[in-house]
Amino acid sequence: MRPLTARQTEVLELIKTTMQETGMPPTRAEIARQLGFRSANAAEEHLKALARKGVIEILPGTSRGIKLNIPLDNEAEEEEGLPLIGRVAAGEPILAQEHVESHYKVDPALFQPQADFLLRVNGMSMKDIGILDGDLLAVHRTTDVHNGQVVVARVDEDVTVKRLEKRGREVLLHAENEEFSPIKVDLANEPFAIEGIAVGVIRNADWM
């Protein structure tokens, strides 16, 4: 890793401290306020420099989209809370370490059954039941699922959140938005796996 400037080190330490204390990275505005930058844009430039040096990864689409590529000073603290899963690589276990963006200090027992991880929602296919783009979906890891449940399913190379309907050797994954057609899966010919069931939603704005 290339050496960091004094300012870059300050930004990195603030990111690490914030993640240890809150379970999530700071926003650009929070970085600017804490370190006395004139604007969030100045914080963004320092984040880009850290990303170029391989210390962090910038995740698009969220104000807290910062992933550390180095361990926190207190690894035990880092592991507290529910892991937040971002993009899932094809063929990789959903809870593989490289998929974990951060950890959120949420009591898993708040959900019934207990949540095992959080999944960042992309898109509005489930909006009619209140699962919106950018939300964090609490998921209980299980393969024991029934018709009508909202599941996290892996279809070939994609992970999707849909309502399950099993029909013999075929599965239908229904959206809760009339603009989306059901996904049909031929179990005899298409890779398919259940990763878990949805047990709750955290509105992403509540964490911003």
Swiss-Prot record:
Residues flagged as site, Cleavage: 90-91
Chain segments annotated as coiled-coil in the UniProt record: none
GO process annotations (BP): DNA repair; DNA replication; negative regulation of DNA-templated transcription; proteolysis; SOS response
Ranges annotated as DNA-binding: 28-48
Annotated catalytic residues: 125 (for autocatalytic cleavage activity), 162 (for autocatalytic cleavage activity)
EC class name: hydrolase
GO molecular function, one term: DNA binding
Reactions the enzyme catalyzes: Hydrolysis of Ala-|-Gly bond in repressor LexA
E.C. no: 3.4.21.88
Keywords: Autocatalytic cleavage, DNA damage, DNA repair, DNA replication, DNA-binding, Hydrolase, Repressor, SOS response, Transcription, Transcription regulation
Quaternary structure annotation from Swiss-Prot or TrEMBL: Homodimer.
Function: Represses a number of genes involved in the response to DNA damage (SOS response), including recA and lexA. In the presence of single-stranded DNA, RecA interacts with LexA causing an autocatalytic cleavage which disrupts the DNA-binding part of LexA, leading to derepression of the SOS regulon and eventually DNA repair.
Family membership noted in the UniProt record: Belongs to the peptidase S24 family.
This protein's name: LexA repressor
Organism for this UniProt entry: Alteromonas mediterranea (strain DSM 17117 / CIP 110805 / LMG 28347 / Deep ecotype)
Upper lineage: Bacteria, Pseudomonadati, Pseudomonadota, Gammaproteobacteria, Alteromonadales
